[in-house]
């Protein structure tokens, strides 16, 4: 992705698919004018913070201003990133977390309860997290919906960020049908947003159900939440723009704080000619 306004370009480069071996994410950042390399970042470590920040923007523009209770499904690094970022845009009073493994959800509750100025409790079912929550966050690798959309109270905001595969989904058709649907990218909603694609295939909604991209709402080109009773969904699959913007910010902070190691790359004309 290229950000002409900031002068940066870059994106994720990663290796994966080597059997059961791990994956590695690297984020190179370049000068968009000269093409010169500026920084090389650990993309995997950056990702939960970047993705959490995108989720927080969605909450800031789509959740009720007085939203204070959060139900979160998932207890991994992405769930932690989402909750930390959410805490920066809303005054949270209570968080309820569910994930299938009791030890994981209890560890999440203990850790995040120590970090946030609110109560964080582990619950025994996804329904217990969702019912009466002002904000619901899903950060899972589930293949099928993780809660019943009929449980959502009017006025709830949902951030779904764990699944961007056309055959998998975190949200059921009821949730999509009831909501004002805002993806990060309109074209992605029809390509790999499994929750939305399933609802289309079931004949419940069509492409016109996409209210706007989040960027359009932020830019004032489309409305966000219009009523307190409205159910809103931000379907976050991640974008190259988010990655480059986050990398650019970290690069600038590193320069200001004098952190990081400097390495030199020879331009191709020099390396290949020896001049």
Predicted regions and their residues:
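Well-ordered mid-protein domain cores that form the structural environment of catalytic cofactors
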Residues: 52-58
């Amino acid at each position: 992705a290229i950000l002409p306004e900031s002068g940066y370009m870059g994106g994720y480069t990663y290796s994966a698919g080597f059997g059961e071996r791990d994956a590695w994410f690297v984020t190179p950042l370049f000068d968009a004018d000269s093409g010169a390399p500026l920084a090389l970042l650990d993309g995997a470590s950056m990702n939960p913070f970047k993705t959490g920040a995108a989720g927080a923007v969605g909450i800031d523009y789509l959740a009720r201003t007085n939203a204070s209770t959060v139900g979160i499904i998932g207890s991994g690094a992405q769930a932690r990133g989402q909750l930390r970022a959410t805490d920066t845009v809303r005054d949270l009073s209570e968080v309820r977390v569910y994930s299938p493994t009791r030890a994981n959800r209890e560890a999440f509750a203990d850790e995040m309860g120590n970090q946030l100025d609110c109560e964080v409790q582990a619950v025994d079912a996804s329904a217990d997290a969702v019912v009466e929550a002002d904000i619901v966050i899903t950060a899972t690798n589930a293949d099928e919906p993780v809660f019943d959309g009929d449980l959502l109270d009017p006025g709830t905001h949902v951030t779904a960020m764990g699944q961007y595969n056309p055959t998998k989904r975190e949200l059921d058709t009821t949730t999509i049908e009831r909501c004002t649907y805002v993806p990060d990218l309109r074209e992605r909603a029809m390509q790999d947003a499994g929750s939305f694609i399933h609802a289309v295939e079931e004949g419940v909604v069509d492409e016109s159900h996409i209210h706007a991209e989040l960027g359009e709402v932020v830019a004032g080109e489309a409305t966000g939440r219009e009523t307190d009773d409205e159910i809103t969904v931000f379907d976050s699959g991640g974008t190259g723009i988010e990655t480059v913007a986050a990398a650019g910010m970290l690069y600038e902070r590193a320069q200001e704080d004098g952190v990081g190691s400097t390495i030199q790359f020879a331009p191709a004309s020099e390396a290949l000619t020896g001049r």
